[in-house]
Amino acid sequence: RGGFSMGSLSADASWCGRDVLAVDDLSDAMLGELFRTASRMRAMVASRGSTDALKGRVLANVFYEPSTRTMCSFDAAMKRLGGEVISVSESTSSAKKGETIEDTVRCLECYCDALVM
């Protein structure tokens, strides 16, 4: 029964603290490693139903526009991999009080490992 670790994704310093806003922000090598890691994670979840590969990690889903499928797919994937999810929408954020999206992101990145927008 082989375990899983984030391997070269987490060991590679080029991923640390990086903002990925578009696929063009990733090199071919990074994309290749990302897809290989995703494939291993998918196979693991398919064979076991879930895993704790991302236990202790927190994902923030930040959606200011309605998005059922995208938001739910990231939420389900993170939970199947053992992580936790914080969901933020415009109605639940401080945007209602005038906070900018940039300020919201700065705040969330202090206690989340990844943000999906």
Positions of PLM-derived features:
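Positively charged, low-complexity intrinsically disordered leader regions
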Residues: F4-A76
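Active-site cofactor/substrate anionic-group-binding motifs, chiefly glycine-
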Residues: V58-C112
